UniProtKB/Swiss-Prot annotation:
SMART domains: RL11. One of its GO terms (cellular component) is cytosolic large ribosomal subunit. This is Large ribosomal subunit protein uL11. Part of the ribosomal stalk of the 50S ribosomal subunit. Interacts with L10 and the large rRNA to form the base of the stalk. L10 forms an elongated spine to which L12 dimers bind in a sequential fashion forming a multimeric L10(L12)X complex. One of its GO terms (molecular function) is large ribosomal subunit rRNA binding. GO terms for biological process: translation. Forms part of the ribosomal stalk which helps the ribosome interact with GTP-bound translation factors.
Amino acid sequence: MKKVTGQIKLQLPAGKANPAPPVGPALGQHGVNIMEFCKQFNAATQAQAKEALIIPVIITVYQDRSFTFVLKTPPAAILLKKAAGLHTEKKKGSGAHKPGKEKVGQVTRKQVEQIAKTKMQDMTAGTLEAAMRTVEGTALSMGIEIVG
C-alpha cells in the first residue's frame, strides 16, 4: 500500500481547473503533476461545467507523487443561490448584507428538499428532515426566504 504524504482540499469551478492559483501552488508543494490533475478534474466535472458550479475536491497525495481525488457535492450556498436565481455564469450574486432584515431571494420547500437530497451524501445529518433544516439554516443566514 502506498504511503499518504498529504491531503489537499480545494473548491474549483467545474470543468475549469487550470495551473494558475490556487491549483498550481497547492499541488506544486506536494510535487504532483499539475496538468495531469487539471485534465482528470476537468474530465470528471465536464457535466457540471454548464451550470457554473463550484465543486469541492479532496486530493490525496502519495509518496511516489501519484494522487487520487474525491469530488464532493457543491456547497449548499451555491445550490441555494442557483435555486433562488442569484447565481449564473455572468452574475455571481451574493447573499444579503443584513440577513434577517434583508431578503435577496426566495426558494420553495420543494427546492430545499431537492438540495438536501443532493447534499445528503456529504452531510452528517441522519435523516432528510435534518438535512433540510441544515439547508434552511444556510438559506436564512444568506437572506434567502423559504416559501411554500
